[in-house]
């Protein structure tokens, strides 16, 4: 007897023709690994980083990313600084905050500092997927 697929998104992949790179910056190892695995399962090219310094290094040395998914509180700085630096460097990216800071004032600060979306921890994977698919549609229409 076949076992049912336990994945919350069986057989779902990004839109055809869209090859999006995602930088995941999260200091909590388990969270980073789960997000990285989920995004890769969905078919995205993922570059994980565990700190502000590591995230900035990846932005500088790796191929351009389409999406930054970052925690706000990092051991050596903030996701605000990461997105701010990406924007200063002229990077046109979709920036998604993933944080335990969920008060309306926290969401407002994230928006004012350059984030396009703010997701609370634990992450609503359905909502994250919808955001990424919207970006994929936009990328597909722009090409």
Report residues per predicted region.
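Active-site residues of response regulator receiver
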Residues: 71, 99
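Alpha4 helix (beta4-alpha4-beta5 surface) of REC/receiver domains from two-component response regulators
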Residues: 81, 102-119, 130
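Non-catalytic signal-transmission and effector/linker regions of two-component phosphorelay proteins
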Residues: 1-23, 36, 124-143
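Short amphipathic alpha-helix used as the core "switch/output" element in two-component signaling
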Residues: 80-92
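Conserved acidic carboxylate
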Residues: 26
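Two-component/phosphorelay signaling modules centered on CheY-like receiver
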Residues: 29-47
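Acidic, metal-coordinating helix/loop segments flanking the phosphotransfer/catalytic sites
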Residues: 48-67
């Amino acid at each position: 007897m076949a076992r049912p697929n336990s994945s919350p998104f069986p057989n779902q992949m990004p839109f055809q023709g869209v090859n999006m790179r995602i930088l995941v910056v999260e200091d909590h190892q388990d969270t980073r690994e789960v997000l990285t695995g989920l995004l890769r399962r969905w078919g995205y090219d993922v570059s994980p980083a565990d700190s502000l310094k590591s995230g900035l290094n990846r932005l500088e040395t790796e191929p351009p990313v389409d999406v930054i998914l970052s925690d706000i509180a990092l051991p050596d700085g903030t996701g605000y600084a990461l997105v701010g630096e990406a924007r200063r460097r002229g990077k046109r990216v979709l920036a998604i905050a993933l944080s335990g800071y969920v008060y309306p004032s926290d969401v407002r600060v994230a928006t004012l500092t350059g984030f396009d979306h703010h997701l609370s921890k634990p992450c609503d994977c359905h909502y994250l997927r919808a955001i990424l698919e919207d970006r994929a549609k936009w990328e597909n229409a722009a090409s």
